[in-house]
From Swiss-Prot:
The lineage of its organism: Archaea, Methanobacteriati, Methanobacteriota, Stenosarchaea group, Methanomicrobia. Keywords: Cytoplasm, Gluconeogenesis, Glycolysis, Isomerase. GO terms for molecular function: triose-phosphate isomerase activity. Disulfide bonds: none annotated. The keyword Transferase does not apply. HAMAP family: TIM_A. It comes from Methanocorpusculum labreanum (strain ATCC 43576 / DSM 4855 / Z). Its EC number is 5.3.1.1. Signal peptide: none annotated. This is Triosephosphate isomerase. The active site is at H92, E140.
Length: 221
């Protein structure tokens, strides 16, 4: 994907389901077309295939499992690819994995030609994740997730230091930041600190006017 990337995670919010989810996806498509900034979405699993078919935007899964076959209820990487997704989140703070599982999921993503967005919670874990050569490492201090307090303002060092740590391991791995991202100023600050984009959720999904929020997010890029 072109940089910067704004990736919107719908989580399991009611506001990110059904018709409301479609309205968010439509707004993301419109703002991406008008601004030229890449806006990806990670909708709920039942929406993956229809959204991939209907909208001209990058669609990511919220999780994949490094399995296939007789594993009821799991989400194999090949299924996500078959649905039309470009990638998947891995190890989100609300769906944590072991180091071995993270590595296996990154490899499953690569095998199925999917981008991998490995979520981390600090500089050390970001460096460890970079060793698996995912597409992105997305650092999110857990205490700021959903807080309305932007990591770009509250803890800019974690962005700057994560970028440095990741690039020391692999210059090919891109870095996103998340937690409390809610405005164009937050996005610009993150990019100025070296990030390749942002990962966010509630500020868009729970907004009364998601399109207006998305327009603000890209306004300073």
């Amino acid at each position: 994907m072109s940089s910067p990337l704004i990736l919107v995670n719908f989580k399991s919010y009611r506001e990110g389901a059904g018709n409301a989810a479609g309205q968010i996806a439509s707004a993301a498509e419109l703002v991406m077309q008008e601004s030229g900034v890449t806006i990806g979405i990670a909708p709920q699993f039942v929406e993956l295939h229809p959204f991939c078919k209907h909208y001209e935007i990058p669609v990511y899964a919220q999780h994949i499992d490094a399995v296939e076959g007789a594993f009821t209820g799991r989400i194999p990487a090949f299924t996500v690819r078959a649905a039309g997704c470009v990638g998947s989140l891995i190890n989100h703070s609300e769906r944590r994995l072991t180091i071995a599982e993270i590595e296996a999921c990154v490899e499953a993503a690569k095998f199925n030609h999917l981008e991998s967005v490995v979520c981390t919670n600090n500089v050390g874990v970001s460096a460890a994740a970079a060793a698996f050569s995912p597409t992105y490492v997305a650092v999110e201090p857990p205490e700021l997730i959903g807080s309305g307090i932007s990591v770009a303002k509250a803890d800019p060092d974690i962005i700057r230091n994560s970028v440095a740590a990741v690039k020391k391991i692999s210059s090919d791995v891109k870095v996103l930041c998340g937690a409390g991202i809610q405005s164009g100023e937050c996005v610009k600050t993150a990019v100025d600190l070296g990030a390749d984009g942002v990962l966010l959720a509630s500020s868009v999904v729970k907004a009364k006017d998601p399109e207006a929020v998305l327009r603000d997010l890209v306004s300073l890029l």
